[in-house]
Amino acid sequence: GQLALKQQTVNRLLNKIYSPISDAYSELKQL
């Protein structure tokens, strides 16, 4: 259970970091 919780936290962190990046990336590709 502890490992799964840790994985969720890591995933959420990665999401927070990568979401703006991928958003900006898709905007760039539309230019």
Swiss-Prot record:
Where is it predominantly found? secreted
Keyword Acetylation carried by entry: no
Q: Where in the cell is it found?
A: Secreted, Extracellular space
- A GO cellular component entry from the record: extracellular region
Q: Which GO terms describe its molecular function?
A: oxygen carrier activity
Q: In which tissues is it expressed?
A: Hemolymph.
Look up keyword Oxidoreductase and say if it applies: no
Q: Which UniProt keywords apply?
A: Copper, Oxygen transport, Secreted, Transport
What is the role of the protein in this entry? Hemocyanins are copper-containing oxygen carriers occurring freely dissolved in the hemolymph of many mollusks and arthropods.
Q: Which family does it belong to?
A: Belongs to the tyrosinase family. Hemocyanin subfamily.
Name of the protein in question: Hemocyanin subunit 2
Organism listed in the record: Maja squinado (Mediterranean spider crab)
Q: What is the lineage of its organism?
A: Eukaryota, Metazoa, Ecdysozoa, Arthropoda, Crustacea
